Structure formats: structure tokens, C-alpha cells
């Protein structure tokens, strides 16, 4: 006589509460403490404490390449961790997020009176530590969304909450540090400004990670994804011309955003050169605000534009706005119009960014239509890897521009009169070139809206025939 073993019924996932959604969104506020403090202020901080712009650029380049490798390893690590009764992603976020806050604080503790070699070593070690912990915590944070719910409306709410959380810290940092960073008079004063503020931010960030752990839930078993080797990733890119075009077009629009990391220096040396302290603080705040937040304001218009112009047309519009902004910044000397030019650059980049992941999905369908094979994982890995590589180059370019224009490191260092003119030219020309190349590459992108309709219809016929 055989006895059947009763299988426990699977628990029906509960609806997410507003606290679950707020808890998840708050996590990206904490994540952005590191990202925003790096992208908005770290290059300026390094250079103001005397680290040469070329050295600063190379630190950024090496660290971002390091981060790209760590992200690949972090994904494998997260897959191998076994869940307990409370899941696994939340505890990984806290496990690495809290130490990351310590690493961020340490980045801004470089003593001003030590040997330059020690300053550089301190900068490298603490920045790499931040990149390591940020990747190890960032991967499970992204995966947590899928483990919380399968409902598409709830997932959209979680994504929106994440965007709000990230943008919120950009605003906080802008109005806290931007007005003051260009008004301090020496390195000691800079340290007294940065360290207490950053330490408070990071303490709050650590508490936010604990809040996330307490308020989020993991109730969906995320199936193990097939491992994608580096060779598979390269094949998916090289054999898929649509994906290859998207990767390079994305890379060059990212390059067009490179001046954001040196925004406070652009404000001081170009837009408010010789101005009083109040005007300098105002201009620095506005430049930082534009780089940090105006793209988020423009983001909701992306789907509307795509509805009328298509994603490819929306990309062209973004590049056109960036090109206009670059030309304006080079030739228009008026401070307020220069700020408009920077805003056009930021809006243009956001419009391009709006379409990247949707177009990535289209390239998967295109490749299946051409070859009969689907490469979802490899395509995502390939695009992400390209973004990391071009992101490294973008991080390098900001400080490198300062070096190429003859800017001297340090605080209140008398700059050659040609520096302001050279900076204006470079800060307009480099983004302009990035947008021009991005638009030129996108011209060859084969998946228009009409073509995609044809691809979907033919794939549907193939799938139906295969199931018959």
C-alpha cells in the first residue's frame, strides 16, 4: 500500500502595503548617499585637497573598472546565498549597506596635512572599499523588488518609489553642501564642512537600511537564473547588431554627462568667476541642482515622446537638446543662459536614458527573429557591462578635462586666466561630441516601431506554429 505525501499549499502572496513600498523606496535614498556624494562632490573634494586632476581621473577610472568586475561577482554571490525564514535579499542589503556607510564616511576623512602619496593611497583604498560594498549590497537590493511581488502594478509602484528615494537625496545634498563647498577658504575648513555632514548622512543611511529590513517582505521565490558566461555575453553582443548599436549609442550619451562630476568647479571658475560669496553659492547650488535633479523632472515626458516619435525618435530629440546645450555653453557668455545650456544637456541625457532598457528588450526580440534564439540574460549582461565600461570612461573624463585645461589642484589657487575660457570650451564641446556620436550611431539602429510590430507578429506566428 502506497501513501502519498501531502504537499503544503503555497501561501498566496499578500498585497503590498504603503509601508512596504516606502520601505523599499527608502533603500535607494540610502544607496544614493554613496552615488551622489561620489558623482556630485568627490572629484571636487579630491582636487581641492590638492590631489592632481590627472591622478583623480585615474583613480575614478580604475575604481569604476574594478566595480564592473565586482558586479559580476556580486551577482554570483547573491545567487549562492541560501534564504532563511526572512528571505535573503534584505539581510544582504543590510549586511553590506551598513559597512558601506562607514566606507563613504572614510572617503571624506583624508587628513589635509599628510604626504601627498598617503593622501592618494587613502583615496584609492577608501574609494575601492565603497565600490566593493556598494556592488555587494546593490545587486540584492535590485533583486529584492522581484522577491516582494509579481504584480506588475505593485512592481511599478516599487520602481517609482525607488526613483523618488534616489532623487530625494540628490535634493538634500544639493541644498546642504553645494552652497558651501565653494565658499570655504582652505583645506581645513573644507574638512570641517564635509566630514560632519557626510557622517550624519551615513548614520541616517545605516538606519534607513535597518528600516528597509523591518518594513519590506520577501514572499516570491525568485527562480535561479541560468548563468551567463563572459563569452556568452560577448557573443550576444557581436552577433546582434541591434544590441551592439544600442551599447555604443548608450556609451556615448553617458560620456556626454561627464561634466557633472566637476560641477562645483565649473560654477566657480566659469560661471561665477570673480563673483561675491553669495552669488558663488547660488550658482554652485543651481549647477548642482541641474546635474542632480532636472533629469528626474524630465523623465515622465519620455513615454509621451515615444508615443509620437518612437523610441528612436525620442533618442534623436534627446541628442538634439544636448547638442544645442553644448553649442550654447560654448558661445553664450551669459550666466543664466549657460545654466539653461547645462539643463538642456541634462534633459537630453535623461531622454536617451529613458529608452535604453526598453530598446534592450526590443533587441532580444530582434535577435530571436533573426536567429531563432533568445538571449535575454546575455543581452542584459552585455548592455550592463558596456554601461560600466563607458561609465568608467565618463568618470575619468570630468577630472581629465580639468587637467587638459591647465587647472591647478588646491583651494583658492590662482588659476591662469585661460583656464576659464578653456573650461567653458571643453565643458560644452565634450558633451556636444558625445551626443553627436550617439545620434550618428543610433541612425543605424534597425528596430523602428514599425519594424518591431512586424517582428512581434512573425514571432507570434512562429510560436503558435510550434505549439500546434
Q: How would you name each of these model-derived features?
A:
Residues 2-468:
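Membrane-embedded alpha-helical bundles of multi-pass transporters/translocases
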Amino acid at each position: 500500500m502506497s501513501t502519498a505525501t501531502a504537499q503544503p499549499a503555497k501561501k498566496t502572496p499578500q498585497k503590498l502595503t504603503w509601508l512596504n513600498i516606502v520601505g523599499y523606496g527608502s533603500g535607494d535614498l540610502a544607496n544614493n548617499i554613496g552615488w551622489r556624494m561620489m558623482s556630485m562632490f568627490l572629484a571636487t573634494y579630491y582636487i581641492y585637497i590638492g590631489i592632481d586632476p590627472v591622478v583623480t581621473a585615474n583613480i575614478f577610472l580604475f575604481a569604476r573598472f574594478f566595480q564592473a568586475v565586482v558586479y559580476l561577482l556580486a551577482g554570483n554571490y547573491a545567487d549562492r546565498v541560501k534564504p532563511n525564514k526572512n528571505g535573503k535579499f534584505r539581510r544582504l542589503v543590510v549586511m553590506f549597506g551598513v559597512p558601506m556607510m562607514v566606507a563613504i564616511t572614510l572617503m571624506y576623512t583624508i587628513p589635509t596635512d599628510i604626504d601627498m602619496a598617503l593622501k592618494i593611497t587613502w583615496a584609492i583604498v577608501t574609494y575601492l572599499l565603497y565600490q566593493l560594498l556598494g556592488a555587494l549590497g546593490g545587486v540584492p537590493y535590485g533583486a529584492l523588488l522581484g522577491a516582494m511581488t509579481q504584480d506588475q502594478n505593485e512592481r511599478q509602484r516599487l520602481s517609482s518609489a525607488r526613483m523618488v528615494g534616489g532623487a530625494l537625496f540628490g535634493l538634500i545634498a544639493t541644498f546642504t553642501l553645494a552652497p558651501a563647498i565653494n565658499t570655504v577658504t582652505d583645506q581645513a575648513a573644507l574638512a570641517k564642512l564635509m566630514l560632519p555632514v557626510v557622517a550624519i548622512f551615513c548614520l541616517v543611511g545605516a538606519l534607513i537600511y535597518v528600516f528597509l529590513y523591518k518594513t519590506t517582505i520577501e514572499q516570491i521565490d525568485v527562480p535561479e537564473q541560468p548563468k551567463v558566461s563572459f563569452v556568452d555575453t560577448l557573443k550576444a553582443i557581436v552577433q546582434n547588431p541591434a544590441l551592439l548599436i544600442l551599447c555604443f549609442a548608450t556609451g556615448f550619451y553617458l560620456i556626454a554627462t561627464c561634466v557633472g562630476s566637476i560641477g562645483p568647479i565649473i560654477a566657480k571658475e566659469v560661471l561665477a568667476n570673480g563673483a561675491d560669496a553669495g552669488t558663488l553659492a547660488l550658482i554652485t547650488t543651481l549647477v548642482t541642482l541641474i546635474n542632480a535633479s532636472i533629469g528626474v523632472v524630465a523623465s515622465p515626458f519620455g513615454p509621451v515622446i515615444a508615443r509620437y516619435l518612437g523610441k528612436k525618435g525620442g533618442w534623436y530629440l534627446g541628442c538634439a537638446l544636448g547638442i544645442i546645450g553644448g553649442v550654447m555653453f560654448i558661445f553664450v557668455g551669459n550666466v543664466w543662459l549657460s545654466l539653461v545650456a547645462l539643463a538642456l544637456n541634462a534633459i537630453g541625457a535623461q531622454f536617451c536614458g529613458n529608452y535604453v532598457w526598453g530598446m534592450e528588450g526590443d533587441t532580444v526580440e530582434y535577435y530571436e527573429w533573426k536567429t531563432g534564439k533568445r538571449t535575454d540574460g546575455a543581452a542584459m549582461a552585455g548592455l550592463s557591462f558596456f554601461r560600466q565600461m563607458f561609465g568608467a570612461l565618463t568618470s575619468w573624463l570630468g577630472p581629465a578635462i580639468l587637467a587638459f585645461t591647465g587647472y591647478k589642484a588646491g583651494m583658492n589657487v590662482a588659476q591662469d586666466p585661460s583656464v576659464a575660457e578653456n573650461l567653458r570650451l571643453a565643458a560644452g564641446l565634450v558633451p556636444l561630441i558625445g551626443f553627436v556620436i550617439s545620434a550618428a550611431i543610433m541612425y543605424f539602429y534597425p528596430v523602428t516601431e514599425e519594424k518591431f510590430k512586424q517582428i512581434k507578429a512573425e514571432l507570434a506566428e512562429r510560436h503558435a506554429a510550434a505549439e500546434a
